Structure formats: structure tokens, C-alpha cells
């Protein structure tokens, strides 16, 4: 049997509990990736315009925005398996209810289901990174986080391939039943697959941190406020930028370049193959290039690709515009996603063990709040017919601001002793 490369062999050495957790994440991500790829197109086929799609989609983020920080404060130092187990049951249920409500034309019910889906996703998102770090030996943190991020790419590949295959078939007659394979069918199949996640989460151990939170669960130590603020600034910038444009890329290709949902899914699958590979080599890239190369370098190139993709709208009648936009789309996501494991590890190292649940919750609140606000902003901008390229330009500016903010965290973490990098909090955030 041929020997695996050294960087890939490190994944084989991960504990079984980490692999179980990653498998559960993969099944949950089948739902979220399917929604990312196809939900807007499904809503468009149901007769909703861009503003209505943005308004309905934004409901997913309201619950997380309002409840994430209280949830993070309460979960500090507590067992995480039960909240994640409950979330893994509720998330597929509410996703299925949302899908069926839209399909039945019951938009008021759909709005409530989207809100409930956001709450159930909150339980999963707040505990995900802290749970992964509790399950993983410190020396294997980079590989564990990269594997978790790679589950998104793997789920997206499955969703894209399934969408392309089903929509390529179009329809099928079985025993007198006429089955139509469209965006709804793909969303339904992948949502049902997500019901396997609770069975995997139920088999996980339930470790608690060595240092439990002391004091009332709402209390945050005074010295931690500056630490938390510095850690969250990059997330605010990047989440707001992403919310303005990334969640609507499928609409950009549909409206500007008249790309079909099947073609978009196929290109998305190609991109996610690269995301999967790029995510797995993140630990090796970080070892060779350091934090700056793994975060600042790859994100800067990704921003340039996003700008180029947006500017193709100005020349959309030219034959080269669509190929250039597709190439930028395929390459941008792997590079931007490649920084994800590194930024998560950097942030968790920066804030220390006692603040991980709180930072994870704050990140969830920021992403949800930013995406909700950005979706509403996008709704207004598109109502006034602002072109997509201008939206992408704003996104790029915000991305660059967030990327440069990470440099401040990198400088602080690099000044610390390597032995303390995984667990010790920064005692002097004012030096950042």
C-alpha cells in the first residue's frame, strides 16, 4: 500500500471522537450547503423577487443575532454535547418545515420556520469550535479545525453533484408517479440526509474544560473586554462584507450572466473540490508560511478575484465576461475558505480557553446580525437597481479591513511562548 504524504497522515492520527464529530458536521453541512447553493434559486422559481428573497432569507439570522451571546455566556464551562444533540435534531426538522411551507405557498408560516431554523442552528454554531477543541489534543488542533472546515466543502460537493445529476435527468416516471428533479428535490434529499447527525453526536464523549467559569454566568471579567473587542473586529468586517454579496452570488450569475442553476451547481462543485483540498493543506501552509501567509496572503488574493468577478458585469455582453467570472468564482472560494481554519485557531488562541464559548457565540451573533442587516441592505440596494459590481466593491473594502485587522492579532500571538499558544489568554490586550 502506498504511503500517505506526511501532511495527510496527520489526519489519520486524529482521535476517533474527532472523526465522529466531523462526520456529524458533514451531515449538518449537507443542509446548509444545499441552502447556500440552491435556496435562493428555489425561492426565485416560486415567484419571489430579489427583495422578497432577501427578506425571507434574513429571518434565519434574527434568532442567532438576539440569542447567541446569552447562549455563549451560559455555555461557558458547561458540557456541550446535549445542546449540540438537541440542535442536530431541531435543525433538520425546521429546515424541512421551511422547505415545505415555501413549496405550499404559505409564506407567513415559512417566515416563522426560517426563524426557528436560525435558533436551532444557533445551538450548533455556538458549541461547534469549543467542542472540537475539547475533543482534540492541543498538538492536533490545526488538523482538527481544518477537517471540520473541510466538511463544508465535502457537503457542498455532494450537493452540487446531486443537483447537477438530478436536474440533468429532469424528470422520471415510476409506477405511475411523475417525479420532477429540480431545486426543491435536491434540497429535500439533502435535508433528509441531515437527520443522521443526531446518531453521531449521541456517541460523543462530553468533556468539560479544566478551568471552569467562576462567578455568575452573565459576568465577563473587565480585562477580557478589550481582548474580546480586538478579536471580533475582523469578524465584523468580513461577515458584513460576505453578507452583502456572497449569499447572493447565485442571483448574480442568474441575473447578470443568465447562468442556469444546474451550471451554477456544477461550477460550485468544482470550486468546492478545490476548497476541500485547500482546507486539508492549511496546517502545512501555516507551518511553512506562518500566520501571515495562511491568512493575510490568501485572503488578499481572494479579494482581488472577487473584485474581478464583480467588474465582469460592466462587460457582460462580451464573450469573455462569463468565463472570467466563472474562473474567479471557482478560485475565490478556496482561497477565502482556506483562511477559515487559521483565523479560527488564531482567534481561539488569542482569547484563551475561558473565553472560547463566548467568542464562538459572539462570532455567531456577528455573522447572523451582519448577514441579516446585509440582506436587508441588499434588498434596498436592489430595489433601487444598484448594480452588483458596486455591491462587490463594498464587500472587497470590508474584506480588506478585516484582513488587516487580523495582522494585529497575529503580532500578539507570535509574541507569546509556543507552549502557551493554545490555552493561555492574553493578559495585556492593550499592546495589540
Label the predicted regions.
Residues 168-192, 380-399:
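A membrane-interface helix-boundary motif in multi-pass transporters
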Residues 167, 191-210, 405-410:
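C-terminal membrane-cytosol helix-exit motif in multi-pass small-molecule transporters
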Residues 145-167, 364-375:
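Glycine-rich segments within core transmembrane alpha-helices of 12-TM secondary carriers
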Residues 89-105, 301-318:
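C-terminal ends and interior cores of transmembrane alpha-helices
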Residues 4-65, 229-268:
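Helix-loop boundary and gating motifs at the non-cytosolic
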Residues 67-80, 167, 278-291, 382-383:
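Helix-to-loop junctions at the C-terminal end of transmembrane segments
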